[in-house]
Amino acid sequence: MGLEQTINSVLSQNSPNDFEFIIIDGGSTDGNKELIETHADRVTYWVSEPDNGIYNATNKAIRVAKGDYVYFLNSGDLLYDQTTIQKIEPYLDQTCGIYYGNLIYQEKDIQVPWIFPEQLSFSFFLTENINHQACFIKRSLFDELFFYNEEYKIVSDWEFLIYAICKRNIPYKHIDMLIAIYDTTGISSNANNREAMNQDKNKTLQKYFPLFVQDYRNIDAIKLKRVQQFLFIKKFKPAWLALKGFMNIVLLFLPKFKKENA
C-alpha cells in the first residue's frame, strides 16, 4: 500500500530533532483511515475527510503547520533514506525561502536520478518544474504570497514557484543531495493530463507574465521564419551554393580577424 510505505519512510527518520508529521486523507474508504489510526501516537495532526483535490488537501496541511518550513509527499512517495531529514535540517537556516534537492524518479521497477539545476530561470519554468517532493518552502511564504490555487488540478505548485522565484525574486538554493523517491504514477505524471496542465500553465503565464509571453512568442516566430528561409534557400541549388560559399569565406576569415584584434 502506497500510504503505508510513505508513513514508514517518514517514521523511520533518525533525526535528533522533532518535526511535525501531518497527514491529510481525503476521506478514503480503502483502509487508509484505519492505517493512520495505528500510527496516531506518532502523527502530529491528521484528518480523514472529503476534500476538493490535491491542493485543497495541501492547503489544509499548510494552515495547521507550525514549523518554519513545509515539505510535501504524496501517497507512494518515499524519503530517500533514513538520514534525509537529518541531512537537510542544517540547510534550513531561513536564509532562503525555497530550498530544493534532487529526486529519484521511480516507475515500477525502474529508478532514474533527476538532478535539478543550480540556477533557475523563467525559461526553465516554461518547460520544467521542481517537483514538490524536492522542495522545502518557508511556511510564511504562503501567507506572504498566496496558497496553492485550488482551481488547478495539477500545476499549482509550479505556479507558486514560478511566481515566487521569477516575479518576486524569493531567494532559493539548490542542495546537491537526493531527497525523495518520487512515485511517477501520480496525476501530474499521467500523459493524459498534459493538455489540462498546459492550459493551466498558460493561464498563469498570462496572469503574471503577459509581456514575457509575448516576447517569447515573437522570438519563436523569428526563429521559425529564419528556419523557413533557410529551407527555402536550400531548395534552390545556385542560392544554396552561394550561401555555403559565403559561410566558408566567413569561417576562413574569422580566425584571422580574431588574431588581428587580439
Question: Where are the regions that the model predicts?
Answer:
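Nucleotide-sugar donor-binding/catalytic module of glycosyltransferases
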Residues: 1-193
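N-terminal leader/capping segments at the start of a protein or of a new domain
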Residues: 82-85, 207, 259-262
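A short, terminal or domain-edge coil/loop segment
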Residues: 152-160, 207, 228-240
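Catalytic core of nucleotide-sugar-dependent glycosyltransferases
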Residues: 177-179, 190-217
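Membrane-proximal basic amphipathic "stem/tether" segments
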Residues: 217-262
